[in-house]
Amino acid sequence: MKLNRVVVTGYGLTSPIGNTPEEFWNSLQTGKIGIGEITKFDHSEFAVHNAAEVQDFPFDKYFVKKDTNRFDNYSLYALYAAQEAVTNANLDVEAIDKDRFGVIVASGIGGIKEIEDQVIRLHEKGPKRVKPMTLPKALPNMASGNVAMRFGANGICKSINTACASSNDAIGDAFRSIKFGFQDVMLVGGSESSITPFAIAGFQALTALSTTEDPARASIPFDKDRNGFVMGEGSGMLVLESLEHAEKRGATILAEVVGYGNTCDAYHMTSPHPEGQGAIKAMKLALEEAEISPEQVAYVNAHGTSTPANEKGESGAIVAVLGKEVPVSSTKSFTGHLLGAAGAVEAIATIEAMRHNFVPMTAGTSELSDYIEANVVYGQGLEQEIPYAISNTFGFGGHNAVLAFKRWENK
């Protein structure tokens, strides 16, 4: 069987630190975080007061007012990011084989705001007043369907939910679909819009969220004073193609996807394995498929949620696989935690880091926990060559998903 090389030819996103790749990368370079006081609902009775909300979402660019009746925000975010990715890739969707054009949009929670709104309506006004579009708007697979319908993609179409590992698993699935010849083009990523009372209350009940009042110190991965993650929102979508397909249409290639590792801790519903056993295996699998040695990896975009449990295990896993020298940073210090969309947005961050040979700092972090042995970049970013990089994501349920990328050098 012929194995195809898989390349990234475009991406788009909406995020707390930018609604274009250029805005997003500029924020990562200059240290502009997207965390602030929650504005989406009254949080006065909550212990949590900060989130990372999408700012200045360009709704009017692709949507009209009635679209809010058809799409939950998580679908709107995915549709926006998908259109931006297709445009960024200069992809003429009418000129490609639609049967070999697939879509995967991951989401950890889906349309939770729609569910919350309609449950309130149910209790206040009765069952006959629940809106007909409630379930279609809320279903976590609907963003994939909506994106496929927007572009007429008749190939693979699915949604993946492995909690906070969802987007990396989606990209890994798309990568393999092209590598093994099932598709030519995949529009893939993740989307989330979960800054809602119920979602915040639920994660608050788990003591998973940061209760720090100062936004600049709310998401501080690997720091000794970290006390939880900051809820973020947004979407990232990438265009993946076989190298042959991309070259045939004269596409600009941004990076190559070279490896994917997926494992399960099978340990605990919400806590990662304390020694990072699943994370270690996932990183090793990604490197094995990429056919690279640990010494070739020059940057790790860490899962780095700013929770006490995650960073201890992840730091140990990184050191076990890659050693103590490879630069590590967490862009969740800028964006908060986008749950099911985290991997896609962080894949874009990783590729941008490779393209610019610059490791973004871990913003807000000032003093590492004593047991953190990984080479965490904080205080300022780091200029260095990045020929290969990996991006880690781990999720509730013990899910571990790791992607390996290669900088594109026209060969």
Which residues does each PLM region occupy?
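Conserved small-residue
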Residues: G10, L28, A82, V103, ...
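Glycine-/small-residue-rich "gating" segment that lines the acyl/pantetheine channel
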Residues: K125-K131, G172, R176, S194-K248, ...
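Active-site-proximal alpha-helical scaffold in enzymes
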Residues: A78-L91, P140-A143, A148-A153, C157-E192, ...
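A glycine- and small-aliphatic-rich helix-loop capping segment at beta-alpha/alpha-beta transitions
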Residues: E22-Q29, K113-P127, S177-F180, I200-E213, ...
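Acyl-CoA/ACP chain-elongation machinery
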Residues: F182-N227, Y260-P274, G304-E311, E325-N375
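Conserved beta-ketoacyl condensing-enzyme motif
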Residues: V8, Q29-T162, S191-I200, P294-N310
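ACP-dependent fatty acid/polyketide chain-elongation machinery
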Residues: M1-D67, E244-L254, I348-T362, K406-K411
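Condensing-enzyme catalytic core mediating Claisen C-C bond formation in acyl metabolism
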Residues: R5-T9, K32-G36, D214-A290, Y299, ...
